[in-house]
């Protein structure tokens, strides 16, 4: 059995350097994986880092541990751009990236940004991606 840590990409963890240091510490402690959330909205103004920027820092700060996002809401991303980002991170990490995709959380992460909030539509977008 393998064990991984997962952390948010906001609040105290809204800094790529902090996440990269924690991933290095997790690797040294023997953990198998280090995953971060892919959220973009909060009720409060708090520090937040793009998960792909953070994963680049994590990839360069670790050697063995598997890395990735817990779930990236594919309907919120352009598939070609996400493909380019994941290939880049996978190369930086020497093949240690795992990509989890889904439709994302509730409407609070979508309607504030003018994105599609309907779950059926997001599901169709996930299938298309």
Report residues per predicted region:
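Glycine- and other small-residue-rich loops at beta-strand/loop junctions that grip anionic moieties
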Residues: 44-47, 71, 122
């Amino acid at each position: 059995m393998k064990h991984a840590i997962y952390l948010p990409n906001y609040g105290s963890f809204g800094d790529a350097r902090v996440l990269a240091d924690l991933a290095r510490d997790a690797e040294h402690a023997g953990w198998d994986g280090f995953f971060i959330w892919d959220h973009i909205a909060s009720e409060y103004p708090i520090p937040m880092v793009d998960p792909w920027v953070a994963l680049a820092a994590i990839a360069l700060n670790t050697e063995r541990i598997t890395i990735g996002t817990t779930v990236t809401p594919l309907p919120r991303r352009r598939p070609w751009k996400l493909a380019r980002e994941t290939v880049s991170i996978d190369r930086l990490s020497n093949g240690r990236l795992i990509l989890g995709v889904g439709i994302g959380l509730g409407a609070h992460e979508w309607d504030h940004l003018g994105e599609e909030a309907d779950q059926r539509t997001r599901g169709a977008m996930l299938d298309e991606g």
